[in-house]
Amino acid sequence: MSEIKIINAKKIYHDIPVIENLNVTIPKGSLFTILGPSGCGKTTLLRMIAGFNSIEGGEFYFDDTKINNIEPSKRNIGMVFQNYAIFPHLTVRDNVAFGLKQKKVPKDELVQQTNKYLELMQINQYADRKPDKLSGGQQQRVALARALAVNPSVLLMDEPLSNLDAKLRLDMRQVIREIQHEVGITTVYVTHDQEEAMAISDQIAVMKDGVIQQIGR
């Protein structure tokens, strides 16, 4: 796990600053939520941390390592999106193992890590199924297991529950909170849902118009 420090971050779209001089420190091992309405810049900031959006100014650190010019695949992050982003042609087991295969980890470690997160996310009974045979909540568990299996330093979650119905959202809040505590990974969670943010977070940053207006517990 890593502390994330962002100093004077700046992002420009079409000559218009959408984030300017943003400063925030995200404690190591915490579940830190960025809460705000659509278009406030929260997903843009998340994508800057991930390396998917360019950084027009400022410095981004994981612990003491400046990551501005490190390509996304080398930042050791896990990501979970609202649309699950799991591979429909792979089984649940192969989806969870995908990142480990990409990293070419030894086979015994691959099997051990895959089984660990299948069990932790309570999806081992679906290991040989394809995603289209799973519910939305089960698919999101697969996405979370795949993100965590590679032992990332940082987990980034972009509106991960927005496509689920009300009951599944409540269930998955509990799952995310419990798993994050158990694994202890630094997690940045983006949502527009205040109730959701209050239910799962160690800290909440309220964002509007590209500015973090308040941080609280």
PLM regions with names:
Residues I6-A9:
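Conserved catalytic Walker-motif region of ABC-type ATPase nucleotide-binding domains
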Residues L35-P37:
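The feature captures the beta-strand-to-loop junction immediately N-terminal to the Walker
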Residues T43-L46, V142:
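ABC ATPase nucleotide-binding domain helices that frame the ATP-binding cleft
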Residues A50:
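Helix-to-loop junction immediately C-terminal to a conserved catalytic motif
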Residues G58-K66:
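Conserved ABC transporter NBD signature motif
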Residues R75-G78, Q82, I86-R217:
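ABC ATPase nucleotide-binding domains
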